[in-house]
Every structure is written in C-alpha cells, then in structure tokens.
Amino acid sequence: MKTTLIAAAIVALSGLAAPALAYDGTKCKAAGNCWEPKPGFPEKIAGSKYDPKHDPKELNKQADSIKQMEERNKKRVENFKKTGKFEYDVAKISAN
C-alpha cells in the first residue's frame, strides 16, 4: 500500500514537471540570443517599412530636459549651502 502511494505520487509529480521540459519552438543563435522575427516581418527593422524613423530632435528632448533639471538642482544646492534654507523655486534664488 505504501509503495503504491509513493509510486502514484511520483507519477503525479512527473506529470506536473513535464510541461517545463517542453520545447518552446525558438532557435537560439547563442545562449540567451533567442529573438526571432514573427513570420512575415523582416530580419532587420532598420530601412524596412516597419522602421519608425524617429526624429533626432524628439529623441534629444529628454536629454535636454535632464540637463536643465541638473542645472536647476545645482543652483538649489549652491543656494542651500550659502543660506542654509532650501528654496524650490529657482526664480526666487536668482533674485537673492
């Protein structure tokens, strides 16, 4: 009885583990490099009709805003070191 119960448990557990061993259909070029284009799409997107052709000015907007943010933060820190009070509004800092 005990061996039958153990055998049934082993069969049940192996049945649960089987899907993990299933082949997922990818053909990896190297370990971890398993990307494949969907059927009907080109191997390379650049230059194809699916290329989004981003405007460089639009792409640089975030970098520019980060530079401006860092400049404002630098002014806030310099003002805090001078006065000992933190002022969020940079326009008020330049007036001092």
UniProtKB/Swiss-Prot annotation:
Q: Which GO terms describe its cellular component?
A: periplasmic space
MF terms (GO), sorted A to Z: alcohol dehydrogenase (cytochrome c(L)) activity; alcohol dehydrogenase (NAD+) activity
Q: What is its EC number?
A: 1.1.2.7
Q: Write down the superkingdom of origin.
A: Bacteria
Q: Does the keyword Signal apply?
A: yes
Q: How does it assemble?
A: Heterotetramer composed of 2 alpha and 2 beta subunits.
Explain the purpose of this protein.
Answer: Catalyzes the oxidation of primary alcohols including methanol.
Protein name as it appears in the record: Methanol dehydrogenase [cytochrome c] subunit 2
Organism of origin: Methylorubrum extorquens (strain ATCC 14718 / DSM 1338 / JCM 2805 / NCIMB 9133 / AM1) (Methylobacterium extorquens)
> Source organism lineage?
Bacteria, Pseudomonadati, Pseudomonadota, Alphaproteobacteria, Hyphomicrobiales
